[in-house]
């Protein structure tokens, strides 16, 4: 089985229908199958609250996800991936869009660039392993005019790859915008990219349980190599192992915007001063002290999802009660706190006792969390989430 097939996460039915659509286009040299696709198979798409469309994942571990939050697919792109970036549009901008999907994040970046730039240039490198996922971006109605620019870049590459055969998209890509589309495993792409080059990285795969290979510590080390010192990575997830992976690969981390979810996503940068908000205090404690903060590993950037998930589970089991406090009932967040719930207290203190911590209010508990006494939401070079987590 090819890695692309193994890594494929969009719904199998829509995947097959898209492939069939473009096969008809290639065989007939006729655009009708592409033009009629959305109306014919509209039920396979998910209409989000802002009027833009998303698609479903296949069922993995008894779960089905969509590519975007139901609150609004294109709105999510602006809120989570564009607004936190603080681009200086007086200078040229370079963006790496990992798991480009339907092209919404790149389209939002183009819209913001056109609105705010004068004589600067924008380069976007879009990376997506699945031709069908990119092709789906050609089939959905454009949620904003700039999506037509992205569609043209996608179409050009799909024609080069002999997946599409007709140049149908009429929008011209502006001369000061350069869009490169890589249809391959992002782990291989990134190893060939230039050092210290990108102002922003958009990391937008399906969840860590579906694509842990794109959330590994080792993948993030490549991010650290290619991003500029003031560059920012944005991802929707608030996952502890993802944030731990960023920290262990040399990044500072902060909380991203809350949009369509209960928690904010994650922002990462070599420079803490470009990150507005620290992680929530309890998140810092769990990452630092419990086994939930053990990152995903993929040392040679070539393992499959199941292997990475299984290996992390094994490492967690070995670390639990030895080098890490058990994450059960979120044990570490109760350190230094008095507990009224006796049943919960017994469970927490049983976990703590296995690490030679007598109680939640013992001197050991207060010593471990000493650095959190200086917690503040605004980050600076000395007082920030990364430093507090490493101190613990």
Residue ranges and their predicted role:
Residues 95-97, 101:
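Class I SAM-dependent methyltransferase core
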Residues 102-107:
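Glycine-rich SAM-binding Motif I of class I
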Residues 1-93, 111-149, 153-154, 167:
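Rossmann-like AdoMet
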Residues 243-267:
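Conserved Class I S-adenosyl-L-methionine
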Residues 136-193:
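S-adenosyl-L-methionine
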